[in-house]
Amino acid sequence: MKVAVLDLGSLFAKIFKLSTASPAVSSHPGGAAATGSVDSGASTSLREAETLTLLPSLPPDTAASREPFTPVHTPLPASHPRSSAAAQRVEATGCSGSLPSSSGASIAPPLTPYSGSAGSVASVTLPSPGVDWATLPSVTIPLGSNSVTASSPRNPRQLRAPGEREPSVWMAPGPVPKTLFFTLPDIGEEWTSDSDSQDDPEGRGLSEGLRKQSSEKSKDPLPTNFTRNVQKAIDKFASESPSSFSSSGSRTPTEAHNSWPGSSTQSSTTGLSTERSSVSSWRDDEFDKVSAQKVHQLFWEVEELLFEGKVSPQTQNLLAECSEWARRSLHLRVVGRQLVPPTDEGFQHFQGSLPSSATHEALPHVPDHTSSSRELCISGSQIVPEVHSASALTDPDGTESADLTSCSSLKEEVYHVDGNIEEYFAFDRKQDGDEHLGQSPALRGRKRHRHGLPPISPDDCIRDAVAAEVFDHVWTNVVEILEDLIRKTWESALTGGKKHKEKLKVAENRSPHVLMSRLSTDVCSVPPSRSSDTLQPSLAPHFNPPQFPQLHRFSSNFYSDLSGVMTIQAKPLQQRPTYSADRTQNDQDDKLPGGGVGASSRHRLGRILDARGPQTSVKKTPVHRRLPSIASDPQRLKTPTVYSDEILRGTKLQTGIDYLPSPAAVQTSRSRLPPIGSETGEPNTAASGSRPVSYRGRHPQSRVFSAMPDSIERSPLRERTIVLEQLSRPSTTHTFRSDTPRKGSLTPVEFVAHTWTGQSILTGSQYLPKSYQRATLTARKRFQVAS
């Protein structure tokens, strides 16, 4: 099919060359001759023409008659066996020389001619014997044509020139066989994709603007399956927009030649769109622009008249009016009072006193600045409107006027009272030397009674700046003068400091033991600490003797070296024989089996219960407020944990009536827990009965006593039963519960003890409730739990 189209194209090219060689071709004998005329414009218009067909356009010097255009349609016989396929192919490609679709097809309407001066149709002859002649129209459209009748697919109605006829079928005279008259369909998007001709690469597609100027057919005689794709493309690009019509409903004449892809294509949005540059919005915008330009030009001319003195024809009338006002009102002034406070930034209104007189009186010039006040100065004369005389006339409209003859003194008259305008400036002036000394006391008093003016003025700011500059200059001179004296003072202070330092070194070398003994006695009165801050109160009297207070101050500020400032030396260990003996006794008590544990625990319990009364006086001793030694920290840290090489052993506590009948019952009501002291045995001292209670500081009881709440021992039978029921639960917080009676009977010493052993209670409580889950109260059962 493509080969057939190419052959037709080459054949038409050859025929076109023959037709251009001879303007008139004679008819073949026995055949019908058809001649056509080319309505061409001037040679310049033909040069600008662009053909819409595959055939090359006519040259400018083509000889053609200047007759009016007549559409010529000569029938073509259906002699080709594959005419149907050829016709469909040529329709898709848009070739003007397409063959008829079938031999028995119906008659189609003719090609709609183009109206205009530049539209031309080239009539080409087919010198083939035995067949009819056909005309191949070649429509030429000049670029940049201003014709308002150019058709577009958006225009449903063609705008025809006056005197132009409707297109009709034109039949050649003579006998003709049964033929098909057809028109070329509108070209869609498929034209470029289906045409693969390499002979005319520039004609593969039409621009969007030229497609819109193609002819519009009244009917579509072809089947819908042939024109479906083309019609979709036409409907897509030729859809109408409501903004393209004017208010009257008819198309505006400027829409045809002003339509361009950006304005004629319908967007996906609905309704009116101002961004499509419709005629109405464009018109309104243009009117606004013109009005704005006129107003801007008027203001510009007024500014030139006022500031530059340039007179333009537009401001000539304004200048004449201003001159008339100046000629008639030589002494026109605006007087009145300030009623509306100013809102401009930097301006403030200060209410003055009411005018006491109604005459035009110029106040004497009095300087505003006095020696005792700092305020702004208001310079000028006061103008007070004069009270009208009895001869003043009153107009019907309420405006007052006076006769010129009655005002022979040329006093100021008030023509009209309208508005509230007043403007004055406050400024700061220089202080005159002795100008205010010769003034009368009345004028001085008048200035002192003026209130409401701001106290700070630019003159005061200048004075402060000058005073600051003078002070800086004087201070610089003072420092230069005192520089030598300050240097000598520093040298003497440094020399005295060095001498004092040497004396201290000699004193330390001579009696180091005496100094350390004094330090140890002072340190014992305060709690020891690992930091060196606690030694500062005791070291200060030794390194800062009262006889050298000033020298030490100078030496600490101006020392250039740090030798002797920080001294590192060995600290003597503090001996605590009482505490070590108590700790040894505790370790021995914890390691005693059976009766030894019960005896020591009973003795410790009795001692704590007896110490409730005098515990206040015991804590007043400074020795009892000392912190525990560092050596006992490892044993205290090991207290919450159970040793891995030991076995936790315990006995069931006695409850009920047989609980605590004698001191021996305390021994059976306690279970064995890991000891606090070291694992190695230490000799037991005989002074355990006389050791004080408060040496335990924060842990007065052993773990055996701290693991059991002592409320069981002191509470009645009813309370003890409740506590036992609570201990039967697998809870780890029963010791610190708020609903137990222990909280009310807890003493400060016992609270400190349980604070230190609280973790051991929580750790060992998971094993303790197992001994209380038995129903028998008198049975004793030993259990072993491995850590």
Swiss-Prot record:
Q: Which superkingdom, per the lineage?
A: Eukaryota
Q: Where is the composition biased (Low complexity)?
A: 51-65, 96-105, 239-250, 262-274
Residue spans of biased composition, Basic and acidic residues class:
201-220
Which stretches does UniProt call biased (Acidic residues)? 189-200
* InterPro entries with a match to the protein in the record: DUF3719 (IPR022194), FAM149 (IPR039630)
Sequence segments annotated as region (Disordered): 22-105, 144-175, 189-226, 238-284, 432-455, 573-602, 665-697
Record's compositionally biased regions (Polar residues): 37-46, 144-155, 251-261
Q: Which family is this sequence assigned to?
A: Belongs to the FAM149 family.
- Per its record, how is this protein called by name? Protein FAM149A
